[in-house]
């Protein structure tokens, strides 16, 4: 599969490394230093390349958006239309001084879907730090793998992203639609799964409890 990565920093860069190692083709983009980005891509092997956000958007069967919250408008402007694309949204709504408040009581995932209305958005790869993801990918046996939660309104898109989560060495756990994404979004707080480490069995129980409205974080 071809994966365009917009934002090849800690989360996006690590995901690109894991995807390339699993046999996917990746294109890294959105850097102030194109030469350094090219070096980063070269370090991932023959399946990786670099370019502009528009290149990543056109290249990818899947596009990963992994930029700071304040950089999203610029990144999307450079990417151009994402209509029909599966977009993995790894962003968290951090702003200077804390978490960015959102209008209308929507989740951050819903807000980003409004910013790219034609995209098939799936929220994932955002609940655990980049260092933790890098060090814990690929645990064996499978039942000990670390969980990455996902939310989205497009079931087929979620299936694709769940497969990529598995390819990256994690276990996927579906929390529902974009309106259900709140518990997996920043900040870390009681009643959320953001910042918490789960195994598959515990994640299934947490997902069921969230749907039933009776979940409290460990």
Language-model-detected regions and their locations in the chain:
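NAD(P)+-binding Rossmann beta1-loop-alpha1 motif at the extreme N-terminus of oxidoreductases
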Residues: 1-39, 43
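Rossmann-like NAD(P)-binding element
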Residues: 45-47, 53-86, 91-96
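General beta-strand structural signal in soluble alpha/beta enzymes
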Residues: 50, 120-124, 173-177
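Short, conserved loop/helix-junction motifs that constitute active-site signature segments
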Residues: 78-84, 116, 140-142
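Rossmann-fold NAD(P)-binding glycine/threonine-rich loop
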Residues: 91-139
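Active-site-lining helix/loop region of Rossmann-like oxidoreductase modules
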Residues: 143-218
């Amino acid at each position: 599969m071809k994966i365009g990565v917009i934002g090849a920093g800690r989360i996006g860069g690590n995901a690109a490394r894991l995807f390339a190692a699993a046999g996917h083709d990746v294109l890294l983009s959105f850097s102030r230093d194109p030469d350094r980005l090219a070096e980063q891509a070269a370090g991932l092997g023959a399946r990786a390349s670099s370019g502009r956000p528009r290149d990543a958007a056109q290249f990818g069967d899947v596009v990963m958006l992994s930029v700071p919250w304040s950089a999203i408008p610029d990144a999307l402007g450079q990417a151009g239309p994402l209509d029909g694309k599966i977009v993995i949204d790894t962003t968290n709504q951090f702003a200077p001084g804390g978490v960015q408040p959102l209008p209308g009581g929507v989740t951050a995932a819903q807000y980003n879907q409004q910013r790219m209305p034609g995209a098939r958005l799936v929220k994932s790869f955002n609940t655990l730090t980049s260092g933790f993801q890098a060090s814990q990918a690929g645990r064996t046996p499978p039942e000990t793998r670390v969980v990455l939660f996902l939310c989205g309104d497009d079931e087929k898109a979620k299936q694709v992203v769940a497969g990529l989560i598995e390819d990256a060495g994690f276990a996927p756990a579906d929390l529902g639609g974009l309106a259900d994404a709140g518990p997996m979004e920043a900040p870390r707080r009681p009643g959320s799964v953001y910042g918490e480490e789960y195994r598959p069995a515990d994640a299934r129980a947490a997902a069921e409890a969230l749907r039933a409205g009776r979940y409290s974080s460990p």
